[in-house]
Regions:
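Canonical RING-type zinc finger of E3 ubiquitin-protein ligases
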Residues: 30-39
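Cys/His-rich, Zn2+-coordinating zinc-finger modules
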Residues: 3-12, 16-23, 28, 44-98
Length: 98
């Protein structure tokens, strides 16, 4: 079923639990707003509302297409190349949000 969502959805990578910090912001002494996790390599980085937009930079630099929120109270995923927002479908799967 997930193949129909987009060709990038199933990454074949089992992401570890996300970290509680943006790994790149910590290196440069900056701050972040929300955190995202790459579903292709597991790196935890900051969102586009953060000053440095590290997750989008990561996507552009290495081409990893899928990320998810790393916020503890949220559950969604984003595909960069297809610009698709995925949410849980209520049956243990995923659906494209309208």
């Amino acid at each position: 079923m997930t193949e129909a969502l987009c060709p990038h959805f199933d990454t074949g990578f089992e992401a570890p639990p996300p970290k509680a910090v943006c790994e790149e912001c910590v290196k440069i002494g900056s701050h972040w707003f929300h955190l995202r996790q790459c579903l292709n390599c597991g790196q935890t980085l900051c969102c586009d509302q953060s000053p440095n937009k590290h997750m989008t930079g990561h996507n552009r630099a290495v081409g990893h297409p899928m990320m998810r929120t790393a916020q503890p109270d949220e559950e969604w995923r984003w595909c960069y190349p297809d610009e698709l927002f995925f949410i849980p479908d209520g049956d243990g799967g995923w659906e494209v949000a309208e």
